């Protein structure tokens, strides 16, 4: 990636829009077959998922996990709170293929409100503050903390114990703070989580329609 500010929006595509209509038929059939997410207790701890949140059919949520209002965990994602706790705040989205785990008894994983976590991210025993965007394929390691309204670029590796100031653009392997975000870029972060809150509502409506249309079991 070049260092020029003008290249930032074009070069970093963290969250790609998708068409819900392309998946409607297949997903409706999947729901009618009774598919549900794997939501599993561990060590006496049961995941606590707000009724307005959405967990996709092929996602896995295990153990001491809390998921807040209008948040979402998408297809193939794994949220594993087995050896410590995980908290996902309100209006936060964990996209397809992401893995969230913890450090055994030392570092939980916390995603504050309005965080967007892109596809195939690994978050391990770290803390991501409010309004951040964690780009596709990136890794954030134990005891790292990402300051509010920051962007972790796609493919970045945030090393253990790294502290990222608020409103930072972080990129590279190992990740470094490239620069501070502009007011315009910070304002643009809202659109990512707002999109996913909308997707939650659409998917819930699709599932309700599919359930209503399904024939009653004998």
How would you name each of these model-derived features?
Residues 2, 13, 19-21:
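Serine residues within intrinsically disordered or low-complexity segments
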Residues 17-37:
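Short, Lys/Arg-enriched N-terminal segments with co-localized hydrophobic residues
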Residues 33, 37-48, 54, 82-90, ...:
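Glycine-rich hexapeptide-repeat left-handed beta-helix
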Residues 62-68:
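N-terminal glycine-rich anion-binding loops that anchor highly charged ligand groups
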Residues 116:
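Short proline/glycine- and basic residue-enriched helix-capping loop/turn segments at helix->loop/beta transitions
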């Amino acid at each position: 990636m070049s260092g020029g500010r003008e290249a930032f929006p074009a070069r970093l595509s963290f969250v790609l829009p998708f068409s819900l209509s392309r998946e409607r038929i297949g997903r409706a059939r999947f729901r009618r077959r009774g598919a549900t997410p794997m939501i599993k207790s561990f060590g006496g701890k049961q995941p606590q998922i707000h009724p307005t949140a959405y967990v996709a059919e092929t996602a896995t949520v295990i153990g001491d996990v809390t998921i807040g209002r209008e948040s979402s965990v998408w297809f193939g994602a794994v949220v594993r709170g087995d050896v410590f706790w995980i908290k996902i705040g309100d209006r936060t989205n964990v996209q397809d293929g992401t893995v969230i785990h913890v450090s055994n008894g030392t570092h939980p994983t916390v995603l504050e409100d309005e965080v967007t976590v892109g596809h195939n991210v690994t978050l391990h025993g770290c803390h991501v503050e409010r309004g951040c965007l964690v780009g596709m394929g990136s890794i954030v390691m134990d005891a790292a903390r990402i300051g509010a309204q920051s962007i972790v670029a796609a493919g970045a590796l945030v090393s253990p114990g790294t502290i990222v100031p608020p409103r930072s653009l972080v990129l590279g392997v190992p990740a470094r703070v490239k620069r501070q975000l502009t007011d315009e870029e910070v304002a643009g972060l809202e659109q990512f989580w707002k999109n996913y809150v909308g997707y939650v509502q659409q998917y819930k409506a699709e599932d309700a329609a599919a359930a209503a249309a399904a024939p009653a079991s004998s």
